[in-house]
Amino acid sequence: MAQQRRGGFKRRKKVDYIAANKIEYVDYKDTELLSRFVSERGKILPRRVTGTSAKNQRKVTTAIKRARVMALMPYVNED
């Protein structure tokens, strides 16, 4: 039988940053906003990490890819 965990902690619900701040258009030129959704290695973070909705994640992904093509953001950060 499965044992119930005691003294566990509640996970905090992740909030969609874009919806919370009422951002309607995710601009590829806004690298400060886009850098919130990119790891330190330069990879796009998944929804389960950032807490964004599916619709906003698609907007963020296309904006990051456009910024990379326009050389506003790096493809890979190697430190």
UniProtKB/Swiss-Prot annotation:
Keyword Ribosomal protein in record: yes
Record InterPro entries: Ribosomal_bS18 (IPR001648), Ribosomal_bS18_CS (IPR018275), Ribosomal_bS18_sf (IPR036870)
Keyword field: Ribonucleoprotein, Ribosomal protein, RNA-binding, rRNA-binding
Top-level taxon of origin: Bacteria
HAMAP family membership: Ribosomal_bS18
Family: Belongs to the bacterial ribosomal protein bS18 family.
Chain's role: Binds as a heterodimer with protein bS6 to the central domain of the 16S rRNA, where it helps stabilize the platform of the 30S subunit.
Subunit note: Part of the 30S ribosomal subunit. Forms a tight heterodimer with protein bS6.
Protein's name in the database: Small ribosomal subunit protein bS18
Taxonomic lineage of the native organism: Bacteria, Bacillati, Bacillota, Bacilli, Lactobacillales
Gene from which the chain derives: rpsR
